[in-house]
Amino acid sequence: MDQSSEKELEKYINNRVQWDSLPSHAKSILDQSHVKYKQYCLKYSIKHQLRWDTNLISSFVTDERLYYQEIVRLSVANLVLYPYHIQDKLVPMLNVTPFKYYLIMMIETMTNSKSYDEIPNFTAVDCIRVLGIGRNQFIDLMNKFRSKGFLFKKKKDVIRGLLPTRSLEKNIEYWWILRYGYPNQDEERQGSLPASELEVLDDLKRSNGINGKQAGIYCRESVISLISKGLVYIDVPIQNQDTISVPPLEGFVMNRVLGDYFENLLYKIFVSIDERTTIQKLSEVLQINVELVKQACSLYCRLGFAKKKNLEPLLPQTPSPSSEGDTHSKWHHSWITYYQENETIIPQPILNNNNNNSNTIDNSNNNNNNNTNITSSSSSNTAINNSSQSSTLENNDNIVEGVVDESFNNGNEEQKRIGFVFDSSITAFLMMGNLGYGLKNHAVTMFERGKLSNEALADFLQELDKIDVEEFVDSEAKLYATNAISLRDTIRHLKNKYRIDDSNSSNSNSSSGGGSGNLQGLDLISCERMNQLDETTRIRVLKKNYSVLISMAPLSIDYCPVISSVPPNFGPAVYEVHSFWFRIYLYSMVGKGPNSILLPKGTRLKRIPTIFKDCEKILVCPIDHDPTTVNLSQLLPSVNETLLSSPVLLSAYTFIKYDTQPKLSKLMSHSRSNSIVSSSKDNQLLYHIPFPLDDLSADNGSPKKYTNIITNNTTTTTTTTTTTNTTNLNNNTIISEDQYNSDNIHTHPILYKIQSTFNLKNSFGYITLLKKETHILLNNNNNNNNKNNINNNKNNNNNNNNNNNNNNNNNNNNNNNNNNNNSITHQKVFEYLPLNVYYGIPIFDDKLNREVCAKIDKFNLLSKENLNRHSMDSRNLSLNLFNFISSTCPPIHPDLDSIDATKINSNLPSVQNIPFPTQIITFVNGNLDL
């Protein structure tokens, strides 16, 4: 059964369609078998833990108790989260509380000697909350278990004796609902429970138990004690109009991902949720049943990963002046005392600046308002930012950040933000770089949730400010620290500066991105998590929340970039731009680039291609991994292995070096030139130049002189003519060795050709040039005739020992051992070739990072007008690239001719499965050959 058929059957099951009402094509999927439909319905219902009484399964399984027992059995076996959404059935009917559920799961795991890493992420977090068993405790218990003898005991009995006997759940919120659990006469009989706990049980029984009451109206210690004894259980109510905020994750366990439906749902909502969007609106954007969204958000709050914003205040809003404030609170004083002792901020009534939502305080149980003593008061949906309640911030940057947050929160609820797209390389160096303990929670949030919201950036920046690069001695650690500083500067630059006006206002302000009004705010978005959403959902989420997307550069090839037409995206325009196709397209359009060969998947290299005979290292670019450099001696086995699973682009990277110094070997071996990138300016291999490029027409209007070395490569001994002339900038790439360096490389003519070809003046990023160093052979006696040359060479051979000290550096390279007839020397020749163009803001180079950010301000690239121009340029680039790919392999987009290039707000037919080449494509000496 294919995936589309499964989705169709699931739709009928969710809609409670009986067998007789199924359409004929659905019955044909099941081979006209009513039994198969029943089996599929049972399997789907248990897997998704559906309620028995409100779903189709009730018509196939008449025993409700047996159905829930099967859910528990399979859920424990598969290490699935406790099904809190059917807790009202599992506890009163089966007496299966979260504590008993996880106790059984832990016993089975330890009995079978499974690793702690096999417990899925969210399940492991809930085990810590209920059992108090984390990774270290699990290892300690396993060691104790192995050390104990169980000759006359069962393994499970030994393990049970090591595990806790009561629930350790203590992190309870006052607004959660307390419900009566499974009746236990032994525990409830007179004298075994304190009077305060008996009062709570009696009150819950009188209110029919299942309806429940808010935990905050009872003594906190009594509530926790009853939960630990299993006499009551907790429900976390979430309503359609609630808003949820997700602070940096604390206590998250990074184990394996289970991949079941609910875990996928949790991650999908994790990256999409924000505190400005109600639960109802979020379900509409994701097109997911609102009950499933409420289940996920309820679990977030239960695990401590999220906070509900529109809470009923713990303290009274207007206490009477003649009495103490807490005497007018409906909440038990123990909760107020607990928050005062353990929390920095007591939940307060929520202020509102939007008159349209003046009466939206959540009623935690709207259906049972009278029974649960839940009241509602007049307040708004927009919460006071926690940072505004803290003390004065430490520095001016943090003050600005506080102003940004305040201006954002007091503005329109639908204010859009800037989205900065990152990949897992950012989270890797934040977690593994030993940069500070405070950064780890933020890194885990960025990796697991896939987003770091604007509200959490102030604390994130404070942690980044603590990094001192000079403290790190190790070069790799210092590199991580430098990258973190670049990330900090980028966040601060984007967060505190830009206003992007979505309206048609013509006002522009170069210092603020061209818009007016409140500052945007900034969200950090993981491309991996965002791409886990299906395409239509991803487009809706991005369009709703963001005014512009900006990618880090370069994004890893291992992950697809976030593609978007609306909002405008300063990153790879389509997936193909993020692949080797764009490199080949760049070389063919500019007419310059390293000699390259694109090999289809399955090709076998039997010998090294002749265009690489003088190379030392080759750049290997698979379609789904980052490029790597390979020594020429290892090229064949390495590339042939990669070609088994992926097409490969091979490009010349470095060349064999000839030594021009005296008394040294002429040919430097591969092993002696492993280090291809040096800190020396003359030995620099790659140059990264930010764009847009500065206009050089203002330099007095006078042309510059360039020294070209014109070579003829048809023979081994090359005759050269050195000429100095005034030439056009666009025709000079081969230059003398001292012409360009890191200070003036930005004036190289090839850069301006690339910018004009791809309209880079409306975007930002950087161009990478490869410094090609080759050696040519010079004839030092080209002023004499051949006869004199031969005679001179004979005399040189006869008197070699007498003339060694008088020879210049070029004669030191003379091939005396082979008795050559000519005096030949090697001379270095440099050529600067485009390697790639990267869109976005670089993080790996602090200097380049500052230069790109300065370009954004200088050219006003985030203005409303430029956003439209950039969108048009990106669309044209995408269409041209599609046509180029289609000209080299079977077309993947047959409707390219029907696409209107002027409709910048419509999506292009890009696909994540980048097309594979079907033939060998070569780029040699500026010519593309198919």
UniProtKB/Swiss-Prot annotation:
Q: Which residue intervals are annotated with compositional bias (Low complexity) in the record?
A: 352-392, 780-822
Query: What happens without the gene?
Result: No visible phenotype.
Q: Which family does it belong to?
A: Belongs to the FAM91 family.
Lineage, top-rank taxon, reads Eukaryota
Q: Which organism is it from?
A: Dictyostelium discoideum
Task: From the Swiss-Prot or TrEMBL record, give the protein name.
Answer: Protein FAM91 homolog
Q: Per the record, which residues fall in region Disordered? A: 349-397, 780-823
Residues spanning the signal sequence = none
Q: One matching Pfam family, short form? A: FAM91_C
